[in-house]
Regions:
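Extended amphipathic alpha-helical regions
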Residues: 4-181
Length: 181
């Protein structure tokens, strides 16, 4: 039995957004050292194959989270194209950053990250020392989001928006500009 291809609508405008190098860089330079060093010494369980599989899964999840920003920026653009078009046309990245940034939403996200890290970061092998022997500290997860995940997601959103008008005819552009928010 074969499963037919799903026919999903094209949501995103054609683009060439790619921050994979930045994702790999912060993963290898920040995340890996955090989870492989204890008491100042590198840990080595000699499970290299398993480690590679976990690294690929982690990198894939991080990239998926960051690249999802394109769908978020497309949604924001569609909600009020007239607000975005001038900033896109002048390539004003600061204006685009202001249009996509919602500080209250970011704060809620950071609170959720902290809460989830508190729960999922526990080391349940040693229940009497669970708080002291965490797999990862909640504050470190929040810092990763503040320093890497959120900024890279915004970079993806802005890079996508800068390409959002590419290939549109003058009539299509005029229709977008005249659409009420």
């Amino acid at each position: 039995m074969c499963i037919r291809d799903s026919d999903y609508p094209e949501i995103l405008h054609p683009h060439h957004v790619n921050v994979t190098h930045e994702i790999v860089q912060f993963y290898t330079q920040d995340i890996v050292p955090q989870i492989t060093i204890r008491e100042g010494r590198p840990l080595n369980d000699r499970q290299y194959g398993s480690s590679v599989v976990c690294d690929i899964e982690a990198l894939s999840a991080i990239a998926h989270r960051i690249y999802f920003g394109m769908f978020v920026s497309e949604s924001k653009f569609r909600a009020d194209p007239a607000a975005f078009i001038p900033a896109i046309q002048t390539r004003d990245t600061d204006a685009l950053a202001s249009l996509i940034t919602k500080p209250a939403v970011e704060q809620k996200l950071l609170e959720r990250v902290h809460q989830k890290a508190e729960v999922y970061g526990q080391n349940l092998d040693h229940t009497h020392q669970a708080a002291a022997e965490r797999k990862i500290q909640s504050d470190d997860m929040v810092r990763l989001y503040q320093q890497y995940i959120i900024p890279l997601t915004k970079k993806v959103e802005i890079d996508y928006l800068l390409q959002r008008l590419d290939g549109l005819s003058p009539d299509e552009l005029a229709r977008l500009q005249n659409r009420a928010a």
